[in-house]
């Protein structure tokens, strides 16, 4: 994660610090004019002086200020660069170029490079948490972990709450396998308002997902503590609540997950994730229907409604309320006639009922056009072709379904066995029928 750039308050962009130039009779008029904001009069004097003395660093510096005042920023920055080339020991030149670059997007790499050069050339002057963190990050990128650790620790000794340094140091500890130090350091990043919760939840989820069985046994409680830290810091943030629920699912705690997603539905009833997770966490069809119907009272986004319509249609079909099932499939397709998942599910249910097979085939074919390698869609289409007695083509699509991941799916194997039997390939049909029943 990039260390966020701060333009420190004492970096004054168009500073007219006298430098040693005020003692230069050739420069004094230019400086006095600039101090009086008379850039148009100062500019030709600076240009004239550069023609006479092209190695006069101060003349380049002040000409750059004149260009900047006129809005010719590229010329200004080139002048500041030339001043640095002529006198690399003058930190004022670095400062003005640094701030000039920082004023625009697209110069981040140049600004970081310049800041690192300033740190290295003038260490006592720029020994701040920001510069030390920037230096530490650069050293990490160049595999100088020991130096990086020193500078990041120095940054935190100056400001223990400086999140960029804490994050970089924690990551350094994690990659080194020093998990005790990691768990001590990373909360500073998680509790800081320096970064948005979107960044923090995304980062923490990536860390959590790396936990396998062994690491969970060793660090489970400490990983839980990180999630709790984030949730306590932002108790009503939707992303933090969602993360806590997903972590409980990931670690096999569905009841705790359900509580988090119930909170999410309560705090953010128009956020579909809470309803969808609750829908799938319950094993009761009756409760699923209740959750889905309640969700429809709050959700307004088209894609969210389609998802709930599709889920409700499947549950209603399972409970035998087929008219409601087909009603919700139709509602979903009115919102998006090309939704591949809805088309496939609707077509498959029609095939199970042996009704409207022509319509089912058309919908299934449309879903396959969107996702030609989807094993479930291939199975649906192949099975419908079987029901319509197009056995040769049914075999082609069901074989594709097996190739694309359906080789362990009992329904796919069963449908393929039916097709083989219809084609008279009894021995192979028996083989797949037996596999489908294991």
Summary of predicted features, one role per range:
Residues 62, 96-99, 134, 168, ...:
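Canonical tetratricopeptide repeat
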Residues 23-24, 57-58, 91-92, 126-130, ...:
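Helix-start (N-cap) detector for alpha-helical repeat units in TPR-like alpha-solenoids
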Residues 48-49, 82-83, 118-122, 154-155, ...:
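Canonical positions in the second alpha-helix
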Residues 52, 86, 121-125, 158, ...:
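Structural marker of alpha-solenoid helical repeat scaffolds
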Residues 19-62, 74, 78, 85-90, ...:
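N-terminal leader/linker segments that initiate helical-solenoid repeat arrays
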Residues 31, 65, 99, 137, ...:
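Residue-level recognition of tetratricopeptide repeat
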Residues 35-36, 69-70, 103-104, 141, ...:
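Register position in tetratricopeptide repeats
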